[in-house]
Amino acid sequence: LGARGLGGEVPKTWQLGFAPGPGQLVRHLSAKGFKPDEMVQANVALSNDGGKLRDRFFNRVMFPIGDAQGECIAFGGRVIGTGEPKYLNTGETPLFHKSEVLYGLDKAKAAMASTGVALIVEGYTDVIALHEAGFTNAVATLGTALTRQHIRILSHHAKSKIIYLFDGDAAGQRAADRALEFIDSSMTPE
């Protein structure tokens, strides 16, 4: 974690974790008495056609994804080293709809309200780095899919500006182009 700029108090502040090698979580939860269907429903395990369970997340730094009040509703994991996908989120659930959640909103909403400004980035580590640098009004879209619901949420907390800070790669440029589609008559792009 330290090599990725996530050392010191960061893991504690952001409740970061680690998902070890494959099969360890399923074995641990089974030993604690959890049933296979409970693990699948909780979105921490997947079941193959033969009914064999496997960990949804392994060999990943884990980021709890909270709602606006900070209650954990999902997880995101970034692979350690090489591997695909680089980032993996919990699947959609009755509580978690990726298009309606902004990572770090619980920690950023007060700063958004006091400054009137929201900074929006693509990923977990971007949010954490900005908060550590003093930009506590930053949130992430959990990838590049900015939605109208995200804009509504941001507009509720940040009354003056929404500043997009997407990555400079092709995916980031596409995200910025899509974000411009959501600008309405009450917003002025800068």
Question: Where would I find each of the regions flagged by the language model?
Answer:
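Conserved beta-strand edge residues that scaffold enzyme active sites
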Residues: 15, 144-145, 168-169
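Non-catalytic interaction/clamp surfaces of large macromolecular machines
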Residues: 2-12
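Phosphate-handling DNA/RNA-contact segment within nucleic-acid enzymes
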Residues: 22-161, 176
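Terminal amphipathic helices with adjacent charged low-complexity linkers/tails
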Residues: 11-13, 18-19
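Phosphate/diphosphate-binding loops
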Residues: 162, 167-190
